A protein has these predicted regions:
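Catalytic alpha/beta core domains of metabolic enzymes, predominantly
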Residues: 33-169
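Glycine/small-residue-rich loop that forms an oxyanion/phosphate-binding "nest" at active or ligand-binding sites
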Residues: 1-37
Length: 169
């Protein structure tokens, strides 16, 4: 379940995420920019109900440098993420490849340096846009536990998103 503060209000987002957690959601996704007290409340409630916390970052304009992406992933971890989700906008293949490089760092243990293996969150990273479309498939091969698809072509929430039908082929 997800409910972005940017698309609603903090109160509404909290109510929606709380309802999802109490009704048995397996995952809740909260943006990295969420106020600390909001994130802490949702994290505590999620732990109480056995729900996994996704702390996510989205860049709708481009793709940060690899060092910036590493810093973002590490910040998500410090905020208590069970899963770190990083989604960038690829303007070209180099942007998409830079986002995928996070999986190499994760595999080498370098993404979350100093964290014991059991303390390292899972990673979901891919790129939006036509130049990044392939990363939505590649991320699954590189270790992401899931990717995002739309119910149909008219339901896409981001550029480059596959439909459920396309993914099932």
């Amino acid at each position: 379940a997800t409910c972005r503060i940017a698309n609603s209000s903090e109160t509404f987002a909290r109510e929606q995420l709380e309802a999802a957690i109490r009704r048995g959601a397996r995952y809740v996704d909260i943006e990295i920019e969420a106020p600390d007290e909001h994130l802490e409340y949702i994290r505590t409630l999620a732990r109480e109900y056995g729900c996994r916390l996704i702390v996510s970052f989205h860049d709708f304009e481009g793709t940060p440098s690899l060092d910036e992406l590493k810093g973002i992933a590490r910040l998500c971890r410090t905020k208590g993420a069970d899963l770190v989700k990083i989604v960038t906008t690829a303007r070209n293949i180099s942007d998409a490849a830079r986002t995928m490089r996070l999986y190499d760092l994760q595999a080498d243990g370098a993404l979350f340096e100093g964290a014991a293996a059991a303390e390292r969150p899972q990673l979901v990273a891919f790129s939006m846009g036509e130049a990044g479309k392939f990363t939505r498939l590649l991320c699954l091969k590189l270790g992401a536990p899931y990717t995002y698809v739309s119910a149909g072509a008219s339901n896409a929430t981001a550029s480059g998103q596959y439909t459920r039908e396309e993914m099932e082929r």
